[in-house]
Curated annotation (Swiss-Prot):
The lineage of its organism: Eukaryota, Metazoa, Ecdysozoa, Nematoda, Chromadorea. This is ATPase asna-1. Homodimer. The keyword Lipoprotein does not apply. The keyword Nucleotide-binding applies. It is an enzyme of class 3 (hydrolase). It holds the Pfam family ArsA_ATPase. It comes from Caenorhabditis elegans.
């Protein structure tokens, strides 16, 4: 259609206010190659770029043929692109927001009553043992605070498959609710503030010190939460392939991001086949022709479903994209749609 948005990531490169960019989708669609390529392009227009892998598989080391750790490391061949790998889900278990909200509601209902202290103990015990994802949420919060202090212009997240990523993006909201409620009930929890502080990795100290630390942390979390839900600061790039399951999961991802108030207006359709033809326009490889026909069907669906998105269509290449020069070359395809016709 004539008013179709440009099939490139130029809109992201031109939006200088962006601070956090998440790249995600179903497993096996090429998220890492796309996130590395996006970071490479951003390094051309921004002063300091950080690429973070939150995927337990940590494929960015393989993509750049360079070992990365938990410390930001300069990517070979670049002057301003750094990369790091973190384990954002050590236990493989997620936070149940419904359980959190139920406990907070119960604690509020019992505030000031005869069962207040008992409920406080139950609340603490539930956090200590019943929600294995709370330490993960705290680690993520501390990581964001640390990254924010390192003065990078923009941060690109190479995320794990969809379900894990959606939990990751819930953490700021989760932490804000938890700390707001704990501080509002500090009269009831006063005798146990040291235990709360230890549980949230804040060390020992007096009740006033614990309250001060929690208040400071809450302010940081509120800032993080506001930024994640601000389209001027944060966006999510969905990566998929032109197949039913991948398209289905992409739609689910976009719906969930919308519910969480997180902006997304870019989709990358990866691994597309453009088979060679003879002088008569016939494709010599029957399997290639069949696969192309399937992909063409889902590309039509994507164009109809996401007409208000920038949809980048990338080809399946003959060789792997590995190493800085190869990633930089591949990244040009995300900027120039004409390059994907070759």
């Amino acid at each position: 259609m004539s008013d179709q948005l440009e099939a490139s990531i130029k809109n992201i490169l031109e939006q200088k206010t962006l601070k956090w960019i998440f790249v995600g989708g179903k497993g096996g669609v090429g998220k890492t190659t796309c996130s590395c390529s996006l970071a490479a392009q951003l390094s051309k227009v921004r002063e300091r770029v950080l690429l973070i892998s939150t995927d337990p598989a940590h494929n960015i080391s393989d993509a750049f043929s360079q070992k990365f750790t938990k410390t930001p490391t300069l990517v070979e061949g670049f002057k301003n692109l750094f990369a790091m790998e973190i384990d954002s889900n050590p236990n493989g278990e997620g936070v149940e927001m419904g359980n959190i909200e139920e406990m907070l509601q119960n604690a509020a209902q019992n505030e000031g009553g005869s069962g207040g202290f008992s409920m406080g103990k139950d609340f603490l015990q539930s956090f200590a043992g019943g929600l294995p994802g709370i330490d993960e949420a705290m680690s993520f919060g501390e990581m964001i605070k640390l990254i924010d202090s390192l003065d990078f212009d923009v941060v690109v997240f190479d995320t794990a498959p969809t379900g894990h990523t959606l939990r990751l993006l819930q953490f700021p909201t989760l932490l804000e609710k938890v700390f707001t409620k704990i501080l509002s009930l500090q009269g009831m929890f006063g005798p146990m503030m040291n235990q709360f502080g230890g549980m949230f990795g804040m060390g020992g100290g007096s009740m006033n010190e614990m309250i001060e630390k929690m208040t400071t942390t809450l302010e940081s979390v509120k800032k993080m939460n506001a930024q994640f839900k601000d389209p001027n600061c944060t966006t999510f790039v969905c990566v998929c392939i032109a197949e039913f399951l991948s398209l289905y999961e992409t739609e689910r991802l976009i719906q969930e991001l919308s519910k969480q108030g997180i902006d997304t207006h870019n989709i990358i359709v990866n691994q597309l086949l453009f088979p060679d033809t003879d002088a008569n326009g016939t494709v010599s490889c029957r399997k290639c022709a069949s696969r192309q026909a399937i992909q063409s069907k889902y590309l039509t669906d994507i164009d109809e479903l996401y007409e208000d998105f920038h949809v980048v269509k990338l080809p399946l290449l003959e060789a792997e994209v590995r190493g800085g020069p190869a990633i930089l070359q591949f990244s040009e395809r995300m900027v120039d749609p004409e390059a994907n016709k070759n």
